[in-house]
Amino acid sequence: MSLFDDNPGPREEVGDSQDLADASESPSADALSPLASDPISCVAIHPGAAHPLASHLPEDLRITWSWPHLLLFVVYAVVSQFAIGIAVLAYYSTNGHLSQRQIRRLFESDPRLIVGTNVLWFGLIILFLYVTLSVLPCLPFWRSLGWKRLDANPLTGKGRPWMYFLSGSGLSLFVIGASSRVKNAEHVPIQEMFKSRSGAMLLLCMAVLVAPMVEETVFRGYLYPVFAGIASRLAQSFGMDSPSAIRAGVVTSILVTGALFGLMHAPQLGWTWGLVGLLILVGIIFTFARAWTGTVFASFLLHLGYNSMLAFLTVLGTKGFTYMPPHR
């Protein structure tokens, strides 16, 4: 399974000449219609009933899933996170003989537990997407979720990969400067992780090695195109022509996906709305890069540069994890 599979395997051949004729008359239908082997996609888009908007959609928005799969994904994400919490609670209650209050404190302050449960949850989410979007319909996983090569073209404003990485690093410096003006920004829950050397190291490893790929796959690879498609169809239902409806859908999805990205981090920030607002802005910028370039790789590089700069400054500020912030 290649990260940049620009030559996906052939789709299932159509059985009779009439179907072949129909496919030739409507080339976009093949790109959007689900395969019979994927029951989730079959519920999402009925075969042979391609939406009139389909022929106008850019290639990176032609996906095999729609709102039914999105609903199933949300349910799965919530249930899996709840199941992980129940499993941890049962383990510590039985083997650790801890009270619920002590366990709750562990969830808030134990870096190994916090990072471990988050990585496990990320893994379960990627597994769900892999099975339902790649294994069942026999499609390339990464390409289906928008991971394609980044074609640099200065004439169209699409830079080289290192430009996105450095832009993400610069964005993190802006956010750090803006955060310094937010009241009580230093008392948010995530700061608890930086009171110990192990906590800071685990968090930064996850932030650089895990979070950019997983979060970009979910937000910019999975959520962005489905929200854009739904919003485009809704806009067209209100009388917009197809190109205008698609533009409206893309803008709406950029804003919605960015807002969800910021809100997902809100508990870590103690729902400090100044900080949450900055993360929403960051999410919007990441999604705009994905929409502009047509590939998740661009937003991934922004995200990687952003988190890498934060990690570098943390290592610098703690003198290589030899000086940790005092407990308050």
Language-model features and meaning:
Residues 155-167, 171, 211:
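Alpha-helical transmembrane segments of multi-pass membrane proteins
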